[in-house]
Curated annotation (Swiss-Prot):
Family statement: Belongs to the IspF family.
Cofactor note: Binds 1 divalent metal cation per subunit.
PROSITE patterns in UniProt: ISPF
Organism this protein belongs to: Solibacter usitatus (strain Ellin6076)
Protein's name in the database: 2-C-methyl-D-erythritol 2,4-cyclodiphosphate synthase
GO biological process entries: isopentenyl diphosphate biosynthetic process, methylerythritol 4-phosphate pathway; terpenoid biosynthetic process
Keyword tags: Isoprene biosynthesis, Lyase, Metal-binding
InterPro entries: MECDP_synthase, MECDP_synthase_CS, MECDP_synthase_sf
Keyword Electron transport: no
Cofactor: a divalent metal cation
This enzyme's EC code(s): 4.6.1.12
Binding site for 4-CDP-2-C-methyl-D-erythritol 2-phosphate: D11, V12, H13, H37, S38, D59, I60, G61, F64, P65, D66, S67, D68
């Protein structure tokens, strides 16, 4: 009988001018981006945490602390690959990724397929195993006021 594990990931980053908006490894044209030690890819960070959590391997901060200058400006897909590889080393395979980006703007619907494809390629999955959804916060709280962006992800692993 196979062993099924589920991991939940969440991340938030402040909106900042002079930064790129990178979501799921895709640069989205925008007059602002997300602030962070790495490239601040809020989606990649949430999925990374979900993989690590499902495999009981800690969290992204444990593996890539923001106090370490090696990760300054780092492409967050590096983090995602690392989590994938660690889970694989423990005998797990990623079965499914479901994620949500919560952001007032820019509107992301035109980037959905590109983001899904980039994530699927990075995780070595068929694209039909990667879901990316977009929501707004309906003008409520820091996300709704356009001051931050959040992402949530749930990952299923099988051994």
């Amino acid at each position: 009988m196979s062993e099924i594990r589920t991991g939940l990931g969440w991340d938030v980053h402040r909106i900042a001018t002079g930064r790129k908006m990178i979501l799921g490894g895709v640069t989205v044209p925008c007059e602002f981006g997300l602030e962070g030690h790495s490239d601040a890819d809020v989606l990649a960070h949430a999925i990374t945490d979900a993989i690590l959590g499902a495999a009981a391997l800690g969290d992204i901060g444990m593996h890539f602390p923001d106090s370490d200058p090696r990760w300054k400006g780092c492409d967050s897909l590096v983090f995602l690959r690392h989590a994938r590889d660690l889970a694989t080393q423990k005998g797990y395979r990623i079965v499914n990724v479901d994620s949500t980006i919560i952001l007032e703007r820019p509107k992301l619907k035109d980037f959905r397929q590109t983001i899904r494809e980039r994530l699927a390629e990075t995780l070595e999955l068929d694209v039909d195993r990667v879901s990316v959804k977009f929501k707004t916060a309906e003008k409520v709280g820091p996300v709704g006021e356009g001051r931050s962006a959040e992402s949530q992800a749930i990952v299923t692993l099988e051994k």
